[in-house]
Amino acid sequence: MATESKCPFNHAAGGGTTNQDWWPSQLRLELLNQHSSKSDPLGAGFDYAEEFKKLDYFALKKDLLALMTDSQDWWPADFGHYGPQFVRMAWHAAGTYRTADGRGGGGRGQQRFAPLNSWPDNVNIDKSRRLLWPIKQKYGQRISWADLLILTGNVALESMGFRTFGFAGGREDVWEPDNDVNWGNETTWLATDKRFTGDRDLDQPLAATHMGLIYVNPEGPNASGDPLAAAKDIRATFGRMAMDDEEIVALIAGGHTFGKAHGAAPESHKGPEPEGAPLEAQGLGWTSSFGSGHGKDTVSSGLEVTWTTTPARWSNDFFEHLFKFEWELTQSPAGAKQWTAKDAPEIIPDAHVPGKKLKPTMLTTDLTLRVDPEFEKISRRFLDNPQGFADAFARAWFKLTHRDMGPKVRYLGPEVPKEELLWQDPLPPATLPAPNAADVAELKAKIAASGLTVAQLVATAWASASTFRGGDKRGGANGARLRLAPQKDWEANTPGELAKVLATLETLQKASGKFSLADVIVLAGGVGVEQAAKAAGVGIEVPFAPGRVDATQEQTDVESFAFLEPVADGFRNYFKGPGSVPVEHLLVDKAQLLTLTAPEMTVLVGGLRVLGANAGGSRHGVFTDRPGVLTPDFFVNLLDMRTTWQPANGVYEGKDRQTGQQKWTATRVDLAFGSNAVLRALAEVYASADGQTKFVHDFVAAWTKVMNLDRYDLA
């Protein structure tokens, strides 16, 4: 009998020094495996849109309305009303969105998970979600957490006398953190030392000015108490959420019409955040040692500010007070910089002591709306036009909470607004007769006879579809915005060549009378793939689903769509210029935005190289003597040990190991598939002697996925 070990068991799965610890620059390919079926308890057959249709929507709203004034002893409601804290919860769920990469936002219920559930700016929002649990429990999977967080904010506003613009459901929960989101490089909460360059220029794609903040420091830059200096940070942060000056003013003032900030005592009284709290805290954090730890003793932001005389009712008090009083810099009980109205009467109600009144108070960033000349103009207009302010806030709130949901076709529920908004990237209704199989076959034959090459057909379809971003559901082939500004002029799309291809395809489209140009572009790409597969000896039909429409220039916000321009697209071996991030990492970033797995990314890169889809006709990575033929030659030749690689003039030269004769040139992206152990393992599958047929079928499957990423009508 084996002797029982006397050694303690000190190791668990996943513990110890990781590969990432040893090699910090290693490709993060695990980011392409996020949110797989293995992490989803609801199973592959679960259809959230169908479940949402079964929801008694107005009964849910009634329950939420009742919750607003059902104060609980364990977390008493300020002013007897939970509305303000639920507005903050919804705001902070949606407010992580940024335009640069479409990541963040409230569309996946990420506020439940680290790091967001433990950000300093989200202090005590964990209590709001716990207050919601009985309602979530009651309605189960017919309402996602992602939808519930936003809907609760809407109901909170309505319960306080505000008329919202509407609400759309359709946000499907995920079950683990979005580890692909880069929140910054700082390792200390509220730090700023690694996100600015030059004259306080915030690095892309970041939007928040501090690690762990949703927006900006409410005490001003570096807690300076300078409201004018705060204007730059405010514009940068809100601007990266696609908000203009009017929307910024409306959101700040509208949000601060309700509730209060909490700073009853120094922050040293706060316990650890949820992710750092002990097991017995059961996911709640920031337990306070000051007084009762809640109610009048609450410590959250460290600021102790109440803006209006009716903190649980919509009013125009914010602007009335902003301009009526003169303000002096003071400190909260926690020592934070804030502003108190000079010589003002005590007109502000205390949140928990009946009859007690306080002087009006403001944040440094509130006063920015008065001292910044452009913000002041808007603020005075809203002061004189309360209805205009209410409408602006309603629209800005709807945009804030729906910006990451993608096109309107994804919206669910009885309160979806009828009005079409430019930021929704609207599409016209379909007006063409639906083509049948014979129509499709006829058009495919004409495309094949058009004189356009495989490379032209494939590159154009890829340029159209690959703008898609899985975060905010923007981009994609539907709309044929490839022919419109700004996309038609993007360097990655080789504008001169693109114009010629589009002209030919548009001629075929108009002659057909049954297809949108968006459909023709995708169909033409499929024709190119089929031709290339046939030349490789594999007969295959690329799936095609008509039904796309063509957007107009008027339906396309040029400034907003500019964020979709690729800085790098490793699938086309395109890189706009040198940067601090190795381009192979940017390939993974692009693949993650396209919701691709590592095998899908691999087969697409290998296929696009041999099909000649590189931007500008570059020959880098075209490891084949048969361009335009869908072979696994990219992988076969990359893994060939008869070739040796050396860096040369910003790229790499592949030379015959014996003769020294140059055979190929490559980028870092190309060589990653031989250098990275995981990618090499995938490449070996296609480079094997039996890899040809599998390669073609896998390429067509991944290609079709990308072409249909924005086809929510097919789901």
UniProtKB/Swiss-Prot annotation:
Transmembrane segments: none annotated. The lineage of its organism: Bacteria, Pseudomonadati, Pseudomonadota, Betaproteobacteria, Burkholderiales. Binds 1 heme b (iron(II)-protoporphyrin IX) group per dimer. Pfam families: peroxidase. One of its GO terms (cellular component) is cytosol. Its EC number is 1.11.1.21. There is a cross-link at residues 91-215 (Tryptophyl-tyrosyl-methioninium (Trp-Tyr) (with M-241)). Belongs to the peroxidase family. Peroxidase/catalase subfamily. The record marks 88 as: Transition state stabilizer. It catalyses: H2O2 + AH2 = A + 2 H2O; 2 H2O2 = O2 + 2 H2O. CDD domains: catalase_peroxidase_1, catalase_peroxidase_2. InterPro entries: Catalase_peroxidase, Haem_peroxidase, Haem_peroxidase_sf, Peroxidases_AS. Bifunctional enzyme with both catalase and broad-spectrum peroxidase activity. Heme b binds at residue 256. It comes from the Bacteria. This is Catalase-peroxidase. The keyword Transferase does not apply. Its cofactor is heme b. Residues 260-283 are annotated as: Disordered. GO terms for molecular function: catalase activity; heme binding; metal ion binding. Formation of the three residue Trp-Tyr-Met cross-link is important for the catalase, but not the peroxidase activity of the enzyme. One of its GO terms (biological process) is hydrogen peroxide catabolic process. It comes from Methylibium petroleiphilum (strain ATCC BAA-1232 / LMG 22953 / PM1). Keywords: Heme, Hydrogen peroxide, Iron, Metal-binding, Oxidoreductase, Peroxidase. Homodimer or homotetramer.
